[in-house]
Amino acid sequence: MTAFIILFIIGTLHNPNNNSEYNHENENQLQKIKHQFNNNKQNKRLLNENSIDVLAIGNSSLYSALNPLQLWHEQGITSYSAAGPSLHISTSFSILKECLTVQRPKVLILEVSNFFETKKAGNMAQNKVLALKYSYPLFEETQRWNEVKNLPIIKRTDFGNHMYYKGYYYNNKVKANQNQYSYMKPTDAREKLLTETKIYLLQIIKLAREYNCQILFVCFPCSTAWTYKKHNIINDISKMTKIPFIDFNTETLLTNFNWKNGTRDGGDHLNATGAYEMTKYLGEYLNQHYSLEDYRQNKLFVKWERLYQSFNSKKN
């Protein structure tokens, strides 16, 4: 309605039958309405468009290990985990591309285990739909929200609390990995990356850098899908591209993570205890190595604190 009023006044101002005094008065009125309209629109979108400073993309290892609400509570960092099971790197690229239409993250965390996904890549249309499915809360109250919320895949999917918690999947079940880190046998060999993976990875790096978004490679503990050969090739890429790489499978003393109580399924995914340790370290790392703002005292971000308190009460 306000937009309609602005258009109506603009039409009136361009009416040649109006005298200059009347035009001047209406011009002042128009500027006031424009100012109010823009401020209201900006305030409404402030917590949505360009509000995420850290965007994380990956597979189920990511959404099980990184808790954006803990990052908020401990560091005041706004983040989102856009992840899906067995996520193909082509979909990772689509997630980044779609999110950049409404967000300007300062840091992009790439969970690197999905670089080795061997299933066939989806086409552009399929990847776009999946990208919006795994990141749709980032589009709420933005200029694209009407488009995204009406997608059939959004309407028919029961996301539970997964998206409500900024992409984090909370699970406090415990099933120990008795073999600990035995899967990480040192070797000089390298796992091969598919040509398709290399192409999409280069596109992701190029796109992120075009938007001045710094990249961080991360691999969370996973005894079923990670090896030293994979570590070696990602470490090579890290050095070649000058992208930092944190591998919690080799840097086992960075946290207090323990395979006895930190996994929900014997070593494939982390549980809430494991995620707490990973997120705590990453929050401190992000705070030390990147210029990220602490929004905890900013009243415009009070919704984040309310959401954290809601999460904290439900998990306890």
Where does each model-flagged region fall?
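Secreted/periplasmic serine-hydrolase-like ester/acetyl group-modifying domain
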Residues: 123-214, 295-316
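Membrane-embedded segments
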Residues: 55-140
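Histidine-centered active-site loop/cap adjacent to the catalytic His
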Residues: 263-304
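Acidic/glycine-enriched edge-of-secondary-structure segments
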Residues: 17-28, 78-86, 178-195
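Conserved, well-ordered alpha-helix/loop/beta-strand core segments that scaffold catalytic motifs
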Residues: 107-119, 170-255
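Second-shell loop/turn segments in exported
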Residues: 56-57, 81-85, 188-194, 219-224, ...
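Extracytoplasmic/secreted proteins, especially bacterial periplasmic and envelope-associated proteins
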Residues: 70, 91-95, 107, 133-146, ...
